[in-house]
């Protein structure tokens, strides 16, 4: 890695010989990044598995994610053999022209008017969850939100399949996800080649998902009538040259969507319940909204997100304080200069941390305070666009963002209309930065029927 002549490295904290900042980062990922940015400014030089820059200037973030995104790809760890083993050649691992071609193919399936068709699926899954809740019961709301969001994703992907098939699919997805978390936590480059029990379980789950998907593809290709589930849309999708995807490519996309389709919004909902429990005024505003929007309508049924701006603002503020995706990592493919003036040598890792940016007092006054009004239209327009990016931006913007918002608002409104959730005693809630940001030991809450 060669530094352009006449340029100096950005400032950063002192590093240990050989291991750099890795021990400090692994010991307290969120705190280390926040402290580094607070002490050393908008471009911080770190040593975490090589030269790394932590960026906290919105213009620099826009540069990496949008303006020069072709120069900043995901890490080889994700795009290499380890990532490909888990996601295949799906959208999350594709790069360059391959990514653009695949995104253009998939985007129509996620247009707002298309995903609106899944409002009934969301309502049915939310109602099924709420029928299992009872006055006075204590639940782990994190488990509940993960479960309902995963059920919705499975139904949206494979809506034509039987409940038994959907249950097998969901179980396999969970097994694969646990193994992925183990791989991403490990610093050992060869751990995915060890013949462990979890590796065998992963392999079985991988084949189960592909088997279910391949059988579903065959039925949909042979069917005389059209279906509107996502798998059917993938089967019908065409590239610009008129060609469709192979069965293998569709399987790769299903594996990608089966994980990415539920975790972000499940974590956002979990943290939203936690935050609402600590703010009676915001809780009352949500109740007023959901009661008014549903006046004269059945307790169960489809929720209209347009009638629930407070629910959307609560979720947005939840993702500000506790962003499900807490860190993006990119790698510079060529030498570059950021808008802030910092020179970036080829091969430099770039850290963009939602945890750090979303709590920056320059853009969010009293940043640790829960205040959904930050996401009223006038407040949004008053701050830089790239001070807040829970779903990413540019060509890597989460393709399922609209689906996530529809799920989140619908589940929050449906549950808030029927129950009040309060924190169960005897807990210390600590955010754990894993693949997503989650409560370390779950989140137990007591239900009170409204």
Model-predicted regions and their roles:
Residues 1-89, 94-101, 116, 120-128, ...:
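N-terminal membrane-proximal hinge/A-helix region immediately C-terminal to the signal-anchor transmembrane segment
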Residues 2-13, 63, 73-83, 98, ...:
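Cytochrome P450 heme-thiolate monooxygenase catalytic core
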Residues 3-6, 10, 34-37, 126, ...:
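Cytochrome P450 proximal C-terminal region
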Residues 8-18, 119, 123, 171-175, ...:
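Cytochrome P450 I-helix active-site segment
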Residues 264-283, 287-289, 402-418:
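Cytochrome P450 catalytic-core helices
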Residues 352-379:
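Conserved cytochrome P450 K-helix/beta-meander segment immediately N-terminal to the heme-binding cysteine loop
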